């Protein structure tokens, strides 16, 4: 099946939000959004970060407990001699686990290479569709999606200056939404160093991971910065939900073009 794609034109904005020029986006930004592939690729990328865990092979077994036998009117579970306290069995206090987690368990969800490429391209295309961006809950007043800024944006080294730029391009409301979303996590995660959870805000895609904006923007709640060479579904569709509000620099668009255009015979 062949799909006829049409290129999209978007405006390049300066640091004050004024339009400088119009450029054509790479053709893959017009690709149909495949939610199923985005979800599969996200799960594959996410599970790669999981750490295998196991149990001590002797956990719950460091005891001399043996069953007292039958005809005593008590359960035949292993018991410690002298005290008669039940031990060792899975249904006893301090006993072994029946099926403990093992390090051999396969944690990574595998995905085909072509599906992975299509999933990333679909996630990129969703950032250029205002319907997906709004459906994800982002708040913005800009008419251009995705938002493309001049390369000078990568040299900003102060978070306050970045906030002024986000305000000029109509994205500052999304930062307010992120700040309002911060709350205490449900469950035991709050005992394990994950007490608070917070929403995802704008994603900034730059051409160089050593740019000053990488560190300065990390001080803004909900904002993530990633280079165009490393951007993946993890960044573009957190939780497997496509349509993250994304800000690109002009140079990063060219890097994405070299990375993806022509790889899938678009």
From Swiss-Prot:
MF-aspect GO terms: rRNA binding; structural constituent of ribosome
Keywords associated with the record: Ribonucleoprotein, Ribosomal protein, RNA-binding, rRNA-binding
One Pfam family matching this protein: Ribosomal_L4
The keyword Disulfide bond is annotated on this UniProt entry: no
Organism superkingdom: Archaea
SUPFAM superfamilies per record: Ribosomal protein L4
GO cellular component labels: ribonucleoprotein complex; ribosome
Gene3D superfamilies: 3.40.1370.10
Keyword Phosphoprotein (UniProt): no
NCBIfam families membership: rpl4p_arch (TIGR03672)
PANTHER family cross-referenced by the UniProt entry: 60S RIBOSOMAL PROTEIN L4
Described function: One of the primary rRNA binding proteins, this protein initially binds near the 5'-end of the 23S rRNA. It is important during the early stages of 50S assembly. It makes multiple contacts with different domains of the 23S rRNA in the assembled 50S subunit and ribosome.
Oligomeric form and interacting partners: Part of the 50S ribosomal subunit.
Name recorded for this polypeptide: Large ribosomal subunit protein uL4
Organism whose genome encodes this protein: Sulfolobus acidocaldarius (strain ATCC 33909 / DSM 639 / JCM 8929 / NBRC 15157 / NCIMB 11770)
């Amino acid at each position: 099946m062949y799909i006829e794609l049409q290129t999209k034109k978007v405006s390049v904005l300066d640091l004050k939000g004024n339009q400088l020029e119009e450029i054509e986006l790479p053709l893959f930004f017009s690709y149909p959004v495949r939610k199923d592939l985005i979800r599969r690729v996200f799960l594959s990328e996410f599970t790669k970060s999981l750490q295998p865990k196991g149990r001590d092979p002797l956990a719950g077994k460091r005891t001399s407990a043996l069953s007292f036998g039958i005809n005593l009117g008590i359960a035949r579970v292993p018991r410690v001699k002298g005290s008669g306290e039940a031990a060792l069995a899975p249904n006893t206090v301090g006993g072994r686990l029946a099926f403990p987690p093992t390090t051999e368990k396969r944690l990574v969800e595998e995905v085909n290479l072509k599906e992975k490429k299509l999933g990333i391209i679909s996630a990129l295309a969703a950032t250029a569709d205002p319907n997906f961006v709004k459906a994800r809950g982002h708040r913005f007043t800009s008419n251009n999606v995705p938002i493309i800024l001049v390369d000078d944006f990568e040299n900003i080294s102060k978070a306050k200056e970045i906030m002024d730029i986000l305000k000029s391009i109509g994205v500052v409301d999304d930062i307010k939404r992120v700040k309002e979303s911060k709350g205490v996590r449900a469950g035991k995660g709050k005992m394990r160093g994950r007490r608070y959870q917070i929403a995802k805000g704008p994603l900034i895609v730059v051409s160089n991971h050593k740019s000053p904006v990488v560190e300065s923007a990390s001080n803004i709640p909900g904002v993530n910065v990633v280079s165009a060479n490393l951007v993946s579904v993890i960044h573009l569709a957190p939780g497997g939900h496509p349509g993250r509000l994304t800000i690109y620099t002009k140079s990063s668009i060219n890097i994405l073009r070299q990375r993806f255009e022509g790889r899938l015979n678009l």
